[in-house]
């Protein structure tokens, strides 16, 4: 272990213990400010950091050119030509950082930096594909931030015990084939050869697209990461929600990624003449379903916490201006970090639906469509994120990720943790998506320090 690294790890450990025991707030703040950096490469105010914020900004701005749209955001759909061009740029960045690059059978890109010991891999990264008319920060921050961490380590001649790998997961957004987190899902063993014949809107199969990537679809399952291969996975990401921005907190410690359940509901009444049917004799499916939608919102809002419930659309039949709707179809989606809470809320929603059935003389039946269990972040990794942020004097907030992430899949096979940086006004999946360069630099510096802390703390037995 080089001297700078040893001094940093010894000092951060002792200082954090002392800071947490300080009962007088000014003393605690002074204590935190005394934690030194690993090496002097850059200063922000009175704090010295290792990542080069201008270099990181430059790579993010360059990446935003691939698929740029007139609104100022990007459309960089997974497996598209713009995605392929962006991937080539990322591969060259990895190679210039001295990483050994490989692409697995699912199209995931890995850049490896050797460690000094034969230990499991510390993996970190994100994705670079976007939604239609998306923003410049979702996925990109964690991808470019991961490469910047490696470049900063090269600058400081830092060596690690564990091998380090930066990963760019393919097709996280799922615009093709209706399969989000596709690359990470294959890597985690959750998706296999059964998905190869799924077609997109152009009639092309996943196998067709993989061949365009230069991959052999028959070897798709070779992309699975073997059990025990990873010491942990870290993902730096924008929050995509409002909480950090509202509270002016620079770093989010992600407790886990919420689970979700989705139902398809059908309300059946009786289609009848709109002019001749008295109001008190109507069995209006659309009116009843509209009450159901409001009931979902009211029940979800009634509980404390960060649970959310959504009805994304409604279809009414027969859909004529002069006919009372006899059928109305709508979905219900519930998300929370606690599956039991989702189930409890759903029970209350169903009770409200039963009341509305009686009031409107209709019947409503709901069928479970999809269920994803929550993915909890590893406690040791959460602690390392807090320690790294404290060493920089950065406040943290514990919060869940309400959006699906690649980390949710990798949590099935390895300890996982996520670092959030604020999203201005909570906007994401939009050209107006924005995170400040300072917040992004803070997140990358925290990632840098977390990698070193985990490298020091893990696999000591």
What is the meaning of each model-derived region?
Residues 68-114:
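A non-catalytic alpha/beta surface segment that caps or lines the substrate-entry region
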Residues 78, 310-319, 331-337, 363-382, ...:
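A short beta-alpha structural unit
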């Amino acid at each position: 272990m080089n001297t700078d690294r040893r001094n940093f790890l010894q000092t951060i450990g002792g200082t954090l213990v002392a800071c947490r025991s300080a009962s007088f707030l000014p003393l605690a703040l002074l204590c935190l400010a005394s934690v030194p950096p690993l090496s002097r490469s850059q200063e922000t105010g009175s704090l010295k950091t290792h990542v080069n914020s201008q270099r990181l900004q430059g790579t993010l701005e360059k990446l935003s050119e691939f698929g740029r749209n007139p609104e100022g955001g990007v459309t960089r759909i997974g497996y598209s030509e713009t995605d392929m061009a962006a991937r080539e740029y990322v591969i060259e960045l990895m190679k210039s950082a001295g990483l050994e690059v490989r692409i697995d059978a699912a199209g995931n890109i890995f850049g490896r930096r050797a460690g000094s010991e034969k230990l499991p891999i510390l993996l970190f990264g994100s994705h670079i594909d976007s939604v239609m008319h998306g923003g410049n920060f979702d996925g990109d921050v964690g991808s470019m931030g991961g490469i910047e961490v490696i470049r900063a380590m090269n600058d400081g001649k830092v060596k690690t015990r564990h091998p380090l790998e930066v990963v760019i997961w393919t097709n996280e957004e799922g615009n093709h084939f209706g399969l989000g987190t596709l690359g990470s899902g294959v890597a985690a063993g959750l998706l296999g050869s059964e998905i190869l014949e799924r077609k997109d809107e152009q009639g092309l199969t996943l196998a067709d697209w993989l061949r365009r990537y230069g991959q052999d679809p028959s070897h798709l399952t070779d992309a699975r990461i073997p059990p025990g291969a990873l010491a942990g996975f870290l993902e730096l990401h924008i929050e995509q929600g409002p909480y950090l921005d509202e509270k002016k907190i620079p770093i989010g410690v992600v407790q886990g990624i919420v689970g979700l359940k989705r139902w398809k509901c059908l309300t059946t009444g009786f289609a009848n003449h709109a002019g001749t049917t008295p109001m008190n004799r109507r069995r209006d499916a659309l009116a009843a379903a509209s009450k159901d939608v409001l009931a979902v919102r009211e029940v979800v809002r009634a509980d404390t916490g960060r649970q959310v419930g959504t009805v994304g659309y409604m279809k009414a039949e027969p859909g004529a201006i002069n006919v009372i709707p006899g059928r109305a179809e709508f979905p219900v989606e519930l998300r929370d970090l606690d599956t039991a809470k989702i189930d409890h809320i759903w029970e209350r929603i169903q009770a409200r639906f039963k009341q509305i059935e009686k009031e409107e003389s209709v019947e409503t039946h709901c069928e479970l469509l999809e269920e994803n269990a929550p993915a909890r972040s590893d406690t040791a990794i959460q602690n390392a994120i807090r320690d790294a942020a404290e060493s920089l004097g950065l406040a943290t907030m514990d919060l869940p990720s309400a959006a699906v992430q690649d980390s949710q899949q990798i949590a099935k096979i390895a300890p996982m943790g996520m670092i959030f940086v604020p999203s201005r006004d909570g906007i994401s999946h939009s050209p107006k998506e924005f995170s400040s360069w300072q917040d992004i630099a803070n997140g990358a510096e925290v990632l840098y320090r977390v990698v070193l802390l985990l490298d020091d703390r893990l696999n000591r037995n």
